């Protein structure tokens, strides 16, 4: 088995979509970075890599058995053994995983560029491990947006877009036709006469479809207005407004 040593990781917990597991250039000063003293490295199929990167579903049992207690984290000069922690690659993408004792990928991290390069060199001549791919059908929806809706966005923009979608989802629950017409008019004032004739579902669906792709000042302004007066959403908004990288 291949091993990496002295690996810096920045764990993103409970993320089912790989686009929320930030690459090194999007790490922030207040992220909690850890040092893995030793971690097993596995080359797997692209299908299995994508499955683990983009879900919180069960990891193949054989893979977990192969890496059991072979990783160590260094904390306060102590070397602590981890049950199921490993790095996987399909030769293209690279992902560190820690299940914190479970059988699903609870924590995920990218590696720093220098260590990514080392991974590519180490697995270049190796065959992928023949782990079975669990049956799985990934479904995207407003609270788990498709990667194509997040393409090209920075970490801050992705976070705000997900906040906008959460607010739109809550708006959908109100079934308030006057309110949804108001917000759709905020987004597209030139369509005001048509919007006034729309049903709740029509107006909401148009607003959702038109905000799905990209990110702009217009998106940001709508998000800020939609969440006003909702403490939980306002807190999430404020967290992204503090001076940070990305």
Curated annotation (Swiss-Prot):
It comes from the Bacteria. It holds the Pfam family DUF3603. Belongs to the UPF0736 family. This is UPF0736 protein GWCH70_0753. It comes from Geobacillus sp. (strain WCH70).
